[in-house]
Amino acid sequence: MQFNPTLDSIKTYEAGKPIELVVREYGIKPQNVIKLASNENPFGASPKVIEAIAKEAVNAHRYPDDSMFELKEGLAGRFGVKSENVIIGSGSDQILEMAVHAKCNASSKVLMSKTTFAMYDVYSRQVGARILRTPSDQHHLGEFWEIYQKERPEILFLCLPNNPLGECLDREEVYDFLQKIDDETLVIVDGAYQEYAAFKDSQKRIDPKDLIERFPSSIFLGTFSKAFGLGGMRVGYGIAQPSIIQALMKMRAPFNITTLSLKAAIEALKESAYVEETIKENFKEMRRYEEFALAQGIDFIPSYTNFITLLLKNRVDSSEFSQWLLERGLIVRNLKSYGINAIRITIGRSLENDRCFELMQEYLHQF
């Protein structure tokens, strides 16, 4: 059977390995598997959110409010915008998909960092767009500008902070750069980890209202999957000028999040204090990873997220290292598929991190 030939250039995205796979393949009990691969909040959603989900389960047979009025109002209030500035998706990556399909076609170009969120590439290839990448792994706006001037792409992707590396540009540096961008270029600012960046350094904070007022051709993406602890609920959002939102709404399928997901996100917005406590604990534990790396003579990228990337260089092979850890019940993310000999580790709970240090040290001491 023949399919769209543009699919030939697309690699199937591989998410972080699930706990269930480790149980099946290695016979390890679920309670002995530690998953530090998918950048989930290890503390989960707040107890009040869990309670709200449980109560809402009796309505699982009902479609959700497709207007998502209450959630849009909550997000509008949080960011000081109007509900017509908000669109909801099944994760922020669904809004990425909407944006690329709404803006691009086979004659379009998109620009992104060499090493960044893989779905930018996937969605762009789906429409046949030409993909432009900077030469450096991390975001360097001088490189973006050099390519932008020559190519004038239809979409510019900025991942702030950047996944899978963890670095983050200062807000003013970003704004100075965006002043030079044409109105016809859609600037997608992916803020999936913005709650972490803003907590660690206020100079990294991107205010969605400020962004879209200064740069009307931009869209800010956020998610409930990371800091809010709702990865399994799959809820993300976009904030942009109404004209952009209206275009994206034409790409949205009806009822694109579930009744339970909608309720969870609405309640999660009320739990800012809980979320902040988990973020504080995240950076407390991250310091332990930085100290471990320094003690082992391993480079790392200073992170503004809930994960840390260890650059292994010639010390050990990241594929062999991550596989060895996997066989012992520790799931981390191997970055070899990005062309980097590195592993990305989600910051877990204290006891999970203890076990991670123990296993990594055991492996590294062999070399």
Curated annotation (Swiss-Prot):
Catalytic activity: L-histidinol phosphate + 2-oxoglutarate = 3-(imidazol-4-yl)-2-oxopropyl phosphate + L-glutamate
Protein's UniProt keywords contain Transferase: yes
Associated pathway: Amino-acid biosynthesis; L-histidine biosynthesis; L-histidine from 5-phospho-alpha-D-ribose 1-diphosphate: step 7/9
EC number per UniProt: 2.6.1.9
Top-rank taxon: Bacteria
A GO biological-process term: L-histidine biosynthetic process
Transmembrane listed as a keyword: no
GO molecular function list: histidinol-phosphate transaminase activity; pyridoxal phosphate binding
NCBIfam families (alphabetical): hisC
Subunit relationships: Homodimer.
Protein name (database record): Histidinol-phosphate aminotransferase
Source organism per UniProt: Wolinella succinogenes (strain ATCC 29543 / DSM 1740 / CCUG 13145 / JCM 31913 / LMG 7466 / NCTC 11488 / FDC 602W)
Top-level taxonomy: Bacteria, Pseudomonadati, Campylobacterota, Epsilonproteobacteria, Campylobacterales
